[in-house]
């Protein structure tokens, strides 16, 4: 069984994902299938939690839509995830930002911004 898991993880090893941390504002392009049609749907929000590592990594993203808080748990290596873009790097002092659930309005999305040096390519 361990060999099978290692084989699957080895096939996913080449997939490049950006460094995502709690507090980051992200845009995730999800592939949505409705009937016979397929389209991309963007989900913008703040990462309030990350869990797992490697191919099992998931993030919980929260956004406010029409005054209602919406959270999605998204597996990063899912075939339905087209792309993950980090819009802003947030500065968080906790690994889980569940306290954002109690906040309303703009305060629900406010996290201090973290300055990140660009990687030389």
Curated annotation (Swiss-Prot):
Stated role: This protein is located at the 30S-50S ribosomal subunit interface and may play a role in the structure and function of the aminoacyl-tRNA binding site.
Any single Gene Ontology cellular-component annotation: cytosolic large ribosomal subunit
InterPro entries: Ribosomal_bL19, Ribosomal_bL19_CS, Ribosomal_bL19_sf, Translation_prot_SH3-like_sf
Family in the record: Belongs to the bacterial ribosomal protein bL19 family.
NCBIfam families: rplS_bact (TIGR01024)
SUPFAM superfamilies per the UniProt record, alphabetical: Translation proteins SH3-like domain
PROSITE patterns: RIBOSOMAL_L19
A GO molecular-function descriptor: structural constituent of ribosome
Domain of life where this protein originates: Bacteria
Name of protein: Large ribosomal subunit protein bL19
GO BP annotations listed: translation
Keywords: Ribonucleoprotein, Ribosomal protein
């Amino acid at each position: 069984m361990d060999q099978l898991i290692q084989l699957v993880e080895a096939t996913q090893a080449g997939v490049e994902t950006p460094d995502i941390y709690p507090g980051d504002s992200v845009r995730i392009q999800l592939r949505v299938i409705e009937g016979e049609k397929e389209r991309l749907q963007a989900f913008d929000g703040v990462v309030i939690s990350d869990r797992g590592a490697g191919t099992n990594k998931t993030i919980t993203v929260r956004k406010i839509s029409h005054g209602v808080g919406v959270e999605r748990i998204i597996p990063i290596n899912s075939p339905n995830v087209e792309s993950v873009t980090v819009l802003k790097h947030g500065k968080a002092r906790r690994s889980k930002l569940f306290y954002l659930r109690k906040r309303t309005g703009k305060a629900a999305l406010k996290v201090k911004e973290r300055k990140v040096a660009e990687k030389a390519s």
